[in-house]
Regions:
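N-terminal helicase ATP-binding lobe
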Residues: 2-425
Length: 425
């Protein structure tokens, strides 16, 4: 896809002090198309999709530099073929060194290849190209890992062994409900602590994308799944804006791999999948990564109205990518629930799971004691300190939390304490 960079017109752009002439456009991808006839006939169309748009859209590109734009508006072939009879020999030598069977290509043959690509691109319907997504993903992956690329390929698409989550316990009522229903998608409604995570993971059949709404919650889920699957071959990655910092103690490859295609389980927020909704740069690689996978949308009820709209659109696209979608929630407005159920294909396609009323009545996880005043809480704090327990005190005003922190600092000067509130920046 980059062999067109051999052209002197590209090479001169790399020289110090080079100034490009106004309106001059040379796209190395177009020059790469001159070598199409080296491929088998059945490979050509896929390779065109990989090459022709891996930097710019094929048609009506925002900069008007798409492959078809340039062909319509200027002598694109004439520009890119310059000195081809000279530089093509070097290009063929590189391709031969990479194992491709080559033969000399005349300017006439290069023109035939160019016109074949033009005709093919005009024949395409609107939509995304999985071949472009694969090329972009592979290109970025290899560029990031360099000589360590091959050693990491064996684990790139390992299907996770999720048998760990077959565990059962009476405290977790969802753990006793079977997950072998043949319907493709899942909607689970159950209280926090009922075993939704295990249930959703047991419903998965392939690689998993596990989404949660908040960075802190996906950090915790990443740690949990990584620990649960530590004795398997599963590759578990974390994807959010600060995820590289989260695994700063890991090896360099792990930090690099987070950003690229592959992994048995990826833990992320829906924002990381938003590129497939907006069609922003690189969305094809994300779509190629998601295609045919299991996607868990957990705690979906916590999103704002705007994010819920994006999530609904994400679900539509996931279905188009043949994903299995599993939704988990503690509570959800009935309108949103039925909207998602309809999107997923209704009861014929969705395994709906809700705990029976008698289970919910007995579902007591905690005992809450009401303290009449602050003075009585000191006994509770003293008892917790003596037992070595951690203590969380929650106030509904920043000023109140600051005053309480000062009091605790005076009462327990030797204990480690932390004050957290929204005015910290």
């Amino acid at each position: 896809h980059d062999i067109g960079k051999v052209s002197p017109l590209f090479q001169q752009q790399l020289k110090h002090g080079y100034l490009r002439a106004p309106n001059f456009v040379f796209r190395h991808e177009i020059a790469s198309l001159f070598f199409l006839s080296l491929l088998k006939e059945e490979e050509k169309d896929a390779v065109i999709e990989m090459i022709v748009a891996h930097h710019k859209s094929v048609y009506e590109d925002v900069s008007n530099k798409g492959f078809l734009d340039l062909d319509e508006n200027r002598d694109s072939f004439g520009i890119h073929i310059k000195d081809f009879s000279t530089w093509s020999a070097d290009a063929l030598g590189i391709l031969a060194g990479l194992g491709l069977e080559t033969h000399p290509i005349s300017i006439e043959e290069a023109h035939e290849n160019y016109e074949y690509a033009i005709d093919y691109c005009w024949s395409l319907e609107d939509g995304w190209s999985e071949w472009k997504g694969m090329l972009m993903a592979a290109d970025h992956y290899a560029s990031a890992l360099n000589e360590k690329t091959e050693v990491n390929l064996d684990n790139l698409f390992v299907k996770p062994d999720l048998s760990f989550y077959n565990r059962q316990h009476e405290l977790y009522p969802l753990s006793t409900i079977p997950t072998d229903d043949t319907r493709k998608h899942t909607m689970v409604t159950a209280p926090t602590g009922a075993g939704k995570t295990d249930f959703l993971l047991r419903r998965c059949r392939g690689r998993v994308f596990y989404t949660l709404p908040f960075q802190a919650s996906i950090n915790a889920m990443y740690d949990r799944i990584k620990d649960n699957l530590k004795n398997t071959k599963a590759q578990v990655y974390l994807l959010h804006a600060s995820s590289e910092l989260k695994v700063e103690d890991g090896v360099l490859e792990e930090r690099i791999l987070q950003r690229h295609i592959g992994a048995s389980v990826k833990v992320l927020t829906p924002h990381q999948m938003a590129s497939i909704v907006y069609g922003i740069k690189g969305y094809e690689a994300m779509a190629a990564d998601l295609q045919g996978c299991d996607v868990i949308l957990d705690e979906i009820h916590t999103y704002s109205g705007e994010i819920q709209s994006i999530v609904l659109r994400i679900i539509e696209i996931l279905l188009a990518l043949d994903c299995r979608v599993h939704v988990g929630t503690a509570t959800m407005p009935s309108v949103l629930y039925h909207q998602i159920l309809t999107l997923l294909g209704g009861q014929e396609q969705v395994y709906e799971v809700k705990l029976p009323d008698e289970t919910l009545r007995d579902f007591n996880r905690h005992i809450i004691y009401k303290i009449d005043d602050w003075e009585k809480s000191k006994e509770v704090i003293d008892d917790a300190i003596e037992k070595g327990n951690k203590i969380l005190l929650v106030c509904n005003q920043v000023k109140r939390s600051q005053n309480l922190y000062s009091q605790l600092s005076d009462l327990y000067p030797s204990l480690k304490k932390m004050l957290i509130h929204s005015r910290f920046k």
